[in-house]
């Protein structure tokens, strides 16, 4: 069996095991699996990786510490144009690959697309549904297609803190469901 076929078989087995882990285990088990099996070029501590689909070339992706990647995020770290070109003239073309690096304390919202050759953060947020085609500067929030700066990490961090009598309080929105519904309906009336 050729080296190419062995690598392809190994990759398919890895993806099959990933689907099993995602289906039958919790988020902590997913993260242990990613770290233990060295799926990515780098996978730091205190991360959350929710996508059920692994990138095709995860060895081109580095994820630092305290990075949260929401469900259905897609990473494009290579293209498949070489396959189309080879059909035209019967020649083999080299795959084009590019790296993605996500630095500490970053968040990528659900259904976002990250195109290769970019870095994100540190202290950066990618809004849900964004298409990231360029680097995301440290301390920024980006959103849209293509992603553009829409806010500041520091301002959001401060806004998310609740203060009472000079103390910072951390709360769980599930404990405040009635209050949040009231705020929601009040905003609809405006």
Map each language-model feature to its residues.
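Terminal amphipathic alpha-helical/low-complexity segments used for targeting or macromolecular assembly
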Residues: 1-41, 45, 147-190
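C-terminal/domain-terminus segments
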Residues: 7-17, 120-132, 141
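Hydrophobic, membrane-inserted alpha-helices
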Residues: 47-48, 126
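Flexible, glycine/small-residue-enriched loop-and-beta-strand segment within the central core
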Residues: 50-120, 146, 152-154
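Nucleotide phosphate-binding site architecture
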Residues: 115, 133, 157
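Short Gly/Pro-enriched loop/turn and capping motifs at secondary-structure junctions
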Residues: 131-133, 147-148
């Amino acid at each position: 069996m050729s080296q190419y076929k062995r690598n392809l078989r190994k990759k398919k087995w890895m993806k099959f095991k990933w689907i099993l882990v995602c289906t039958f285990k919790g988020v902590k088990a997913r993260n242990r699996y990613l770290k233990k099996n060295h799926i990515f070029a780098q996978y730091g501590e205190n991360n959350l990786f929710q996508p059920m689909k692994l990138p095709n070339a995860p060895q081109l992706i580095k994820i630092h510490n305290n990075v949260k990647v929401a469900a259905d995020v897609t990473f494009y770290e290579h293209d498949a144009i070489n396959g189309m070109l080879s059909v035209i003239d019967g020649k083999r073309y080299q795959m084009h690959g590019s790296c993605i690096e996500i630095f500490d304390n970053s968040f990528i919202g659900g259904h976002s697309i990250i195109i290769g050759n970019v870095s994100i953060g540190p202290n950066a947020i990618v809004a849900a549904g964004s298409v990231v085609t360029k680097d995301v500067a440290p301390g920024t929030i980006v959103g849209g297609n293509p992603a553009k700066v829409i806010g500041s990490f520091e301002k959001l961090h401060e806004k998310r803190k609740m203060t009472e009598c000079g103390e910072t309080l951390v709360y769980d929105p599930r404990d405040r469901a009635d209050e949040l519904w009231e705020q929601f309906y009040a905003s609809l009336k405006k």
